[in-house]
Amino acid sequence: MNYTNWLYFPMRLAWRQLIFDRTKLMVAICGVLFACVLVFMQLGFRDALYASATSAPVKLDGDLFLMHKQSEAMWRPIEFKRSELMRALGNPAVADVFPLYLGLAPFKNIETKVKRTLMVYGFDPDSTSFRIEAINNKREALKLKDTVLFDEYSRPEFGPIGQLIAANQNWTEIKDYKVAIIGLFRMGVSFAADGNVVTSDINFMRIFPKRSLDNIDVGIIKLTPGSSQTSVKGELEKLLD
C-alpha cells in the first residue's frame, strides 16, 4: 500500500504535465508517430533492396561465383574470357564450372507492343546452373531455336504472359529478335530490371549477335563434396587473374 501511494503522486504529476497543454501534446505525439513511420519505411526499403539484390544470385546453383574484378554488380558485369573460368578446373576441389551470360534488352509486350527492359540470362542447357525446378525441367526444350522462359514474378507491364501461353499467343520480340515463350519460372525483379528471361547460351547469342561465347559475365563453380569454400576461394584468387 505504501508503495502504491509513493508511486501515485509522480505518475499523477507527470500526467498533469502532459495534458496541461493539449496542443503541444498532440504535436509531440504526431512527431513521434511520424518518426516511427520513417523508421519502418527505411526498414522496408532496406529489405526491398536486399531482396532485389539477391533474387538472382540465390537462385544460381553453385558454391562459388567468378566475376570480373571491375564489375560493380551482377546486373552490371564486365565480360571476361571463358578460358579464365576453365582454369578453375585445375583446382582438385572444383568439380565443374558453367558459364553464365547476362544482358539487358527491351521486351515487347505481346498485346500492347510497348517495350520494357528486362534481364536476359543465357546458360548451357546441359548444365544445372539454376536452383529453379521450372528451368531445369525445360532444359531440353530450351535447346530448340528461339525459345525462352519468362519470369512470372516480372512486373505486370509485360503482359499476362501465362494466359497468352495458354492461348498459344507466345511469340514476341526481345531486342527486335523474335522468340517463343515456352514456359514460366519464378525469380523476382530487381532495381536493374523489371523482369527476367532465361534461354540457352546459343539463343542468347542470337538475341545479342555482337556477343561471343568466349566472353562470359559470370562463372558458376561447383565444388566436390566436403570441400571448404573459404579455402578454395583463396586458392582460386591466387590462381586466376
Language model segments and positions:
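N-terminal Sec/SRP start-transfer signal
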Residues: M1-V39, L49-Y50, S55
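Membrane-interface junction motifs in transport/secretion proteins
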Residues: F34, F45-R82
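Envelope-exposed proteins and targeting segments
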Residues: L60-G62, A93, V114-M119, L144-D146, ...
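Solvent-exposed, non-transmembrane alpha-helical starts
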Residues: M74-E79, I110, V114-T117, T128-I132, ...
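The feature marks short, hydrophobic/small-residue-biased sequence motifs that occur predominantly
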Residues: R82-M86, G90-N91, A95-L149, K175, ...
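Short, solvent-exposed hinge/capping segments at secondary-structure junctions
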Residues: P125-E133, F150-A167, I207
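Mechanotransmission and gating elements of multispan inner-membrane complexes involved in transport
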Residues: S154, E173-D241
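Short conserved beta-strand and strand-loop elements enriched in small hydrophobics
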Residues: P160-A180
